Amino acid sequence: MLEGFQILVQNTVQGTIHKIKCVCDSQMSVSEMSCSESTSACQSLEDGSVPEILISLLYNATNGRLSAEVIKGSHLKNWAANRPPNTYVKLTLRKSTDQEMSKCKISIRRGRPNPVYKETFVFKVTLFQLSHVTLMLSVYNKSSMRRKMIGWIYLGLNSSGEELNHWTEMKESKGRQVRRWQALLESR
């Protein structure tokens, strides 16, 4: 059972830090996170036909923090118009019972098929809970009238294939960031 959790959002593009407290007892600063920047170059998985998202995962077992950095998107399309999309990403953390624990949203990146997000979300999740949660990332195109989902992925309990490999490697990495391109499951 999750006692409480806290989310820190750092927008590294604009240099601002936002704290969102959700059913929590304590505050934490970004300086308390032990994130190490990966020096390896990451290349997109696909040739341009599939929308993708570059995600970095980190779990710190010492303080029970799950960090998910949404770095950038690639080949995101605007199905409704012949212009680049205005995109944002929504992260939803769910228990094994499919009960929503938390949701957060990245600010909109306007007119970019390959947007750079560089926003980090930190969730408090104990080590024994880590195998029983799912992180869903949904990418949306926002127009003046409505929003349309471009695609989504699951990481964690309800994932498979490359998404499950990413999650498993993060759990076994002993506090090291694990970056991967993930192909979005398209929603038309």
UniProtKB/Swiss-Prot annotation:
Cystine bridges: none
UniProt tissue specificity: Expressed in mature peripheral blood neutrophils (at protein level). Expressed in heart, pancreas, liver and skeletal muscle. Expressed in umbilical vein endothelial cells and melanocytes.
Alphabetized Gene3D superfamilies for the sequence: C2 domain
Keywords, ordered alphabetically: Differentiation
Induction: Up-regulated during neutrophil differentiation.
Biological-process GO terms, alphabetical: cell differentiation; positive regulation of CREB transcription factor activity; positive regulation of dendrite extension; positive regulation of ERK1 and ERK2 cascade
Domain C2 intervals: 49-182
Record-linked SMART domains: C2
Top-level taxon of the source organism: Eukaryota
SUPFAM superfamilies assigned to the protein according to its UniProt record, in alphabetical order: C2 domain (Calcium/lipid-binding domain, CaLB) (SSF49562)
Molecular functions (GO terms): phospholipid binding
Domains: entry comment: The C2 domain is necessary and sufficient to promote melanocyte dendrite outgrowth.
Protein name: Putative synaptotagmin-14-like protein
Organism: Homo sapiens (Human)
